[in-house]
Amino acid sequence: MKAISVLGSTGSIGTQTLQIAEEFPEQFRVVALTAGRNLKLLVEQVQRHRPEVVALADSDLLPELQERLKDAGVTGADAPQLVGGADGLNVAAAWDSADLVVTGIVGCAGLLPTLAAIRAGKDLALANKETLIAAGPVVLPELKKSGSRLLPADSEHSAIFQCLQGTPWAENARLSTGVPTPGLRRIQLTASGGAFRDWTAADLEKATVADATSHPNWSMGRKITVDSASLMNKGLEVIEAHYLFGLDYDHIEIVIHPQSIIHSMIELADSSVLAQLGWPDMKLPILYCLSWPSRLETPWRRLDLTEVGQLSFRAPDPAKYPCMELAYAAGSAGGTMPAVMNAANEEAVAQFLEEKIHFLDIPTVIEAACERHKPDLMAQPQLDDVLRVDQWARTAVREQVNRGVTRLPMGAIAA
């Protein structure tokens, strides 16, 4: 039986991970949970899974959680150890009895707990892509030092990882080196196109929060759904793929695939192309992380290509998706630039969700932060440098929003 810790248990990745644990009680045991402010759901999770430790990001909520657990009958030997704050999250992430840590905390907030798990030698199911995007130069040496294995829990990188299992370089694809995988020529990341894939560039002028958070294929959190609509999510995945598999950015491509059946493809040295297919369901890549290197039989819906009918593909329009171009540029710049770009995007999306800026303002404020950072870019940052520029970028975006955003004309960034 594999003991798992779930960081961000009340979020989209966390809840689906716990559903899998319930479906396979003889395979997985939950030993640690961390959460934000959804105490009602967290108490229900504790009742069902009986973890050894529970951590809250906000330590001020610990007394309320303790009372809620008591009212729910979780007392005495059944009660988990409760810890809070940043230190508490790190304690849960490095929990001694855990074999695998699922990192489902959204955004750069997941960086420090992920590093704590790595330094404790834990294997990771990485759903928090921002960890590598913002701090790849910091994380990769830590992985090498600890011997932790990093398995991708998002659908695209899981697809690449699964395809590599069918090559002679499978052992080299444990995702802990960041060096080029031999024989891997090209990666093609598939994108649904998000909520606005069938909108024209002109239509985006009337985009609302409700529009941007209505994904046609996937069930995900609000922030990542907005990132999907802007194609920033795919741009972030390009940077993550660079760190995971070691390919240069010129060899990592994005292709829009509206059906979301092919989850990504790899091209090998002999020009063969391998792909992983399945219905758009995040539980599949999460399960593979939990069960790897084995595969578990499931009663889940099986793929029927005759039901799908056809698979279509098209190139993304850089003028319509300027965030994609910003991600490529930040990744190519390297150093602290991806951290600045990622933090600026997180803050810009938060401002959009609060209806303080328009959807089309998101790339404008991101680009402004990246431009301001260019003179101060650090090529070989340490952890403190990453955390510092992360906070700087968030502040820069808020200040720009408060001053008022002068939107760039459509296509200006791509040009």
Swiss-Prot record:
One of its GO terms (biological process) is isopentenyl diphosphate biosynthetic process, methylerythritol 4-phosphate pathway involved in terpenoid biosynthetic process. Catalyzes the NADPH-dependent rearrangement and reduction of 1-deoxy-D-xylulose-5-phosphate (DXP) to 2-C-methyl-D-erythritol 4-phosphate (MEP). The keyword Lyase does not apply. One of its GO terms (molecular function) is 1-deoxy-D-xylulose-5-phosphate reductoisomerase activity. Mn(2+) binds at D154, E156, E237. NADPH binds at T10, G11, S12, I13, G36, R37, N38, N128, E130, G221. Its cofactor is Mg(2+); Mn(2+). Pathway: Isoprenoid biosynthesis; isopentenyl diphosphate biosynthesis via DXP pathway; isopentenyl diphosphate from 1-deoxy-D-xylulose 5-phosphate: step 1/6. 1-deoxy-D-xylulose 5-phosphate binds at K129, S155, E156, S192, H215, S228, N233, K234, E237. Its EC number is 1.1.1.267. Belongs to the DXR family. Gene3D superfamilies: 1.10.1740.10, NAD(P)-binding Rossmann-like Domain (3.40.50.720). The keyword Oxidoreductase applies. Disulfide bonds: none annotated. Keywords: Isoprene biosynthesis, Manganese, Metal-binding, NADP, Oxidoreductase. This is 1-deoxy-D-xylulose 5-phosphate reductoisomerase. It comes from Synechococcus sp. (strain CC9605). It catalyses: 2-C-methyl-D-erythritol 4-phosphate + NADP(+) = 1-deoxy-D-xylulose 5-phosphate + NADPH + H(+).
